[in-house]
Each structure stands twice: as C-alpha cells, then as structure tokens.
Swiss-Prot record:
Source species of the chain: Mycolicibacterium vanbaalenii (strain DSM 7251 / JCM 13017 / BCRC 16820 / KCTC 9966 / NRRL B-24157 / PYR-1) (Mycobacterium vanbaalenii)
InterPro entries per record: aa-tRNA-synt_IIb, aa-tRNA-synth_II, aa-tRNA-synth_II/BPL/LPL, Anticodon-bd, Anticodon-bd_dom_sf, Pro-tRNA-ligase_IIa, Pro-tRNA-synth_IIa_bac-type, Pro-tRNA-Synthase_IIa_type1
Name under which the protein is recorded: Proline--tRNA ligase
E.C. numbers: 6.1.1.15
Enzyme class, UniProt record, top EC level: ligase
Gene expressing this chain: proS
Length: 585
C-alpha cells in the first residue's frame, strides 16, 4: 500500500507541548500520532491508530495461539455485580459512576472480572467444558486524580484482559504459565526491554501475582532485583528479611527499659543527637530508634479508626507499600485536629505503651522481633524510653510491610544485595483462585457428579500504554524510532529533489515496493527537503529512502532510522534490496 503525505491527515509540530513532561508525550503529539481532548483523554489520529492496531493484533495473535477466544463486553456496566464483590465501594473515587434517566446506577468498567465470571456461569455447567480461556480488547476507565505523562496514565485506555477458567489448581497453573510465556513473546516482538517482578494483587484479589515492567527512568513503579539470584519484585511485594528472635532467657538478661528526659527532641535526628551525648555506653544511630507513625484507616463501608505503625527510625514509610498492605482500606495521616482529639497522642513522643493502653491497633515493621531493643517515645513531652524490648515491654498486634525498601538491602532470598530501578507496568498476571467464583457461586458438575467450584486466572496487558512505552524506549533527539513490528509504515520515501524525473522515479520506486508487499509512506509534498527530512526523522518509520540529487546518477540513499546507518544503493534493483533489508530487520 502507498500512502501519500499530500493526502494524509497529519500535521507535525516543531515545538514540544507546554504540558508534556516525558519524551513519549512530547513526541507522540509533535509527530501527530495523538491529540489531547481533555485531562487524561486522547484522540488517536491515523498514524497513532495504525501503531495501536499493530500492537493489538500482535497481542490478539498470541492470545489465539494459547487457545484464547475473543469476546467483547460493554464498557457501560450495571452496579449490581460490582456490589456483589464489594468493588463498587473498594474502587472509591477512581470509579466513574453514572445514572440513567430512571436513576439506575452504572459504572464505566475499570476491569471486567465480574462480567466474565457471570457469563461463564450462565453458559457452562459441566467439567467437560473446561479448561476455558477468554479475552477481550476493550477500553477501560479510571478517574485518575492526576492524569499525567500523556497516554502512559490516562482516564481512558485500551487493555487486553483475559481470564482462564479451570476446575482444579493444576489447570490454573497451566493457564498461568501459558499466559506468562505468551506475554514474553509479545514483548519480545514489540522490542520492549522489560523485567518480570513479583507483585501484590491489590483489589484484584488472588494469590500468585507477577508484573511485567518496562525499563524506564520515567516509570512510576520502583522495583528491586538481586543480580546474584535473579530475584525481582516491585517494592510493594518485597518481604523484609526478619532477624532471628532471641530466647526468653536471653531477653531476661537484657537491660531494663528506662525513661529519660530528652528535652526538645521531636524528630529522629534530634533524638539521635541527644542519645549520643547522653553517655548510654554505645553509639546510637537512627536504626536504633523506633518511629511511630499515626494514621486513620477506614475499611470499605466502615468508620475511621486509629492505627499506629512502628518502623525503624532510619526508614521512611513508603506510601505504596503502606497502601498495598492496607488495601482495600483507605488511609490518611493524622492532622492537628486529630491529635487534639486524642490527648494521649503526644506528637513527636509517641510510644507503644499509650497506643496499646488505649486500644489503638499497633503494627510494626518485621524487623521489630522479640528481643530487639529500641529507643522510642515515652508518651510525654520531652521524654523517651531507652532499651524498650519487643516481646518483653510491649507486644504489637502484628507486622506490616510499610517501611521503604532501599538499594543495598539484603534480598529476601539471602543471595545478595538488592539494586533498585524504575519501570512502567505493561502487563500483570494473577492466579485469582476462587475469589470471584465464590462471590457468584460459579459451580459446574464435576466428573464424580458433584459440584466443583471454578478457579480463575486474570491476565492484563496495557495495549495503548505500550505505544507510549515503545516511544519512551525507542527515540532519539530527532524523533521516534519505531521497531518494524509496530511502525505505521515499512518505508518512508522522501522526494528531496524538485526535478520531475526524480519525482517520477520516486513514485515508480514506491509502486515497486508496493508490489513486493511493502507498506510505503511517500512524501510527495512540495515542502523543502529540510522540512521533509525533519518530519521523516520525527515520524520514526524504520527505513527512509531519499530520492534526491543522486537520482540523475542512478543512486538513492537508504537510511536505517532504527540503527542509524546510511547507504547509497543503485536505483536498479533498489526495491528488492530495500525489501531484503526489511526482511532482515
């Protein structure tokens, strides 16, 4: 096929959009692939839609290859199924809610587990109908508080979500592995650099969970990995290595807890300064202190309750880890009004004693094991307690993974230190188990004639996000550099000479390429060569053929936009040579 730029619906921009923060956002708008229509909302113009459809088809082919069957649910969904699973409430403000003219409640689907489960329950009733793998490629909607980075985080986005249905856990494991391997093939075809990390399931529920993260400095997700063992996880899923607890006899021999007047020491830094000037007989660091952070937490449909979180003083609380640990509950830090309401909370001097005495739930970092001694608040202004021992002087209500994970921390598998990096989530696979089947009573008749509850897997890929991810990983200072598998065209032919013979020759070359099955973009505009070259580099088609001054000598120039090489090739046989270059890309 030949597309003439003189007829193509396209306008490129020379300057970056004022609100664009990341390279993909800037380049996709400048190159005319997408246009913003509102916060987090984008129109797909012809070039952008071609890239999107190519990614979509790669995903579709791989899903079909593992036995997936494509269906399509509406984006507008009734409230009732999401009430059954409590996700009408759990999703909170991220859910787009609306009513029809009869005041019936609806939502714009953020995900479709409920609909898949109900559909399979309604259609199939025997173990003979399984295993089953269904998928859809559908727009999803989430009311992001701060849409950012263009199509990387929008309010409307295209996703592939697939679901496996099996009658036993072995079937679920097979489906999980099949999807995991299919995802690896997909991302390899798309030339995306990625890492697979352990993850938490969040509001989706379920047990085993892994994310596919595209490597990117602009990614919102932080992950860590151990280079010695290959362990990798996002920070929400990292399990803290727990020190060995000591025996009760050893605990009995520890120094007694003592309260000290520490003066004006409401911060960890001021407390450490005091401790090192107080002749405690040892050097004190922030890691020897216990910082107690106060929150208010509300379960879906419940009331606000106080929660104390104790972490070593050298660690900050990580909002993502805290949120993942508390999900589906929402939380907020206490403000001055809250502290005024609870006078036993002495800001800057909070300790476990007052929390436990007043019935406040108190969770601590896993490092706070029995026998560890801490310097922490004594619940009085200007006072702290030294050598407060866990398991002897206080017993928390449990542990919570809320402290930040740092580069250099020991890997949970004990193989070496962790290194940190940033990434963009492009895929997620879950072993959901029976959470949704339980919610809807999705049973079928088993081989023994008794009911069997279905077990499910859920597998998502951000199709529209992948357009931006590929643009992030494959661009330079001149513009985009699309891999051949997703480029809107195979070859961009630039007529860089006003000579009539060169124009005719370029048109004939494009026709020859078309006959060889090459998808050609022909820049037949009357613009200057400089404008045409800039647009060719900006648009990012992997192969650029320049028909210019060399035409009179029987020469055209072939440029590899992806690799950067340039070659002069004879006009005779040029189409075949270009086609061969494409085949080897």
């Amino acid at each position: 096929m030949i597309t003439r730029m003189s007829e193509l619906f396209l306008r490129t921009l020379r300057d970056d959009p004022a609100d664009a923060e990341v390279p993909s956002h800037k380049l996709l708008i400048r190159a005319g692939y997408v246009r913003p229509v509102g916060p987090g909302l984008y129109s797909w113009l012809p070039l952008g839609l071609k890239v999107l459809r190519k990614i979509e088809n790669i995903v579709r082919n791989e899903m079909n290859a593992i036995g997936g069957q494509e269906i399509l649910f509406p984006a507008l969904l009734p409230r009732a199924p999401y009430e059954t699973t409590n996700r009408w409430t759990e999703y909170g403000d991220t859910l787009f809610r609306l009513q029809d003219r009869r005041n019936n409640d609806y939502l714009l689907g953020p995900t479709h587990e409920e609909m898949f489960t109900l559909t399979v329950k309604g259609e199939y009733s025997s173990y003979k109908d399984f295993p089953l793998r269904l998928y859809q490629i559908q727009n999803k909607y989430r009311d992001e508080a701060r849409p950012r980075a263009g199509i990387l985080r929008g309010r409307e986005f295209l996703m592939k979500d697939s679901y496996s249905f099996d009658i036993d856990d072995d079937g679920l494991k097979n489906a999980y592995i099949a999807h995991r391997e299919a995802y690896q093939r997909i991302f390899d075809l798309l030339k995306v650099r990625y890492v697979i990390v352990s993850a938490v399931s969040g509001a989706m529920g379920g047990s085993a969970s892994e994310e596919f993260l595209a490597e990117s400095d602009v990614g919102e997700d932080t992950y860590v990995r151990c280079l010695q063992s290959g362990y990798a996880a996002n920070v929400e899923a990292v399990v803290t290595m727990v020190p060995e607890p000591i025996s009760s006899e050893q605990i009995a021999g520890l120094a007694s807890a003592t309260v000290h007047h520490t003066g004006d020491t409401p911060t960890i830094a001021t407390l450490v300064d005091w401790a090192n000037g107080a002749d405690l007989g040892r050097t004190v660091t922030a890691a020897d202190t216990l910082k107690n952070v106060m929150l208010k937490v509300r379960e879906p449909g419940g009331e606000w309750e106080l929660l104390g979180v104790g972490v070593p003083g050298d660690r900050e609380v990580d909002d993502k880890r805290l949120g993942a640990a508390l999900e589906p509950a929402e939380y907020a830090m206490l403000d001055d009004a809250d502290f005024a309401r609870y006078p036993f909370l002495v800001k800057g001097y909070i300790g476990p004693k007052a929390l436990l005495a007043n019935g406040v739930r108190y969770l601590v970092d896993p490092r706070v094991v029995d026998g560890t001694a801490w310097i922490t608040g004594a619940d009085e202004l200007g006072k702290h307690v030294v050598d407060l021992v866990a398991g002897r002087d206080f017993t928390p209500d449990g542990t919570i993974e809320a402290a930040e994970v740092r580069e250099g921390d020991p890997s949970p598998d004990g193989a070496g230190p962790l290194v940190a990096a940033r990434g963009i989530e492009i895929g997620h696979v879950f072993q959901l188990g029976r959470k949704y089947a339980d919610a809807f009573g999705a049973d079928v008749l088993g081989e023994n004639g008794k009911p069997v509850r279905l077990t499910m897997g859920s597998y998502g890929i951000g199709v529209s996000r992948l357009v931006a991810v590929i643009a992030e990983q494959h661009h330079d200072e001149l513009g985009l550099r699309w891999p051949s598998t997703v480029s809107p065209f195979d070859v961009h032919v630039v007529i860089a000479n006003k000579d009539a013979d060169a124009r005719t020759g370029a048109t004939e070359l494009a026709a020859e390429l078309d006959r060889l099955g090459v998808d050609v973009l022909l820049d037949d505009r009357t613009a200057s060569p400089g404008v045409k070259f800039k647009d060719a580099e900006l648009l990012g088609v992997p192969w650029i053929v320049v028909v210019g001054r060399g035409w009179a000598d029987g020469i055209v120039e072939l440029r590899d936009r992806f690799g950067g090489d340039k070659h002069e090739i004879p006009v005779d046989g040029a189409a075949e040579r270009i086609s061969a270059a494409l085949a080897g890309a």
